[in-house]
């Protein structure tokens, strides 16, 4: 699993690390993985994660228990990322679906994020841009 910290602020930031108990958002691609880092979540923070588990260990916990734990964090969401990515035109767009779902709690306007997505994927062609934007919008609607 990969973990990254991202801090956004209008003022100077003395460290790029997020202290435990202070994260406004934990964004994840796998439900059990986000729970491993839930101690970083602020009391009013939310978890947004892809719903689909990546079961790569023989003793993976019962999935409903994981869903229940994620849902115990107020405002948190399990996103049907694979189905939405397929609806967008490419099953590999799950990350963009999850980012779209997070857009409602990020301090950045969705239109700003969409402009960045368009710029980032422009070199890959209009079809790739369109699929990523559709995946983002589908996630945003969830």
State where each predicted segment sits.
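Active-site cofactor/cluster-binding pocket
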Residues: 1-142
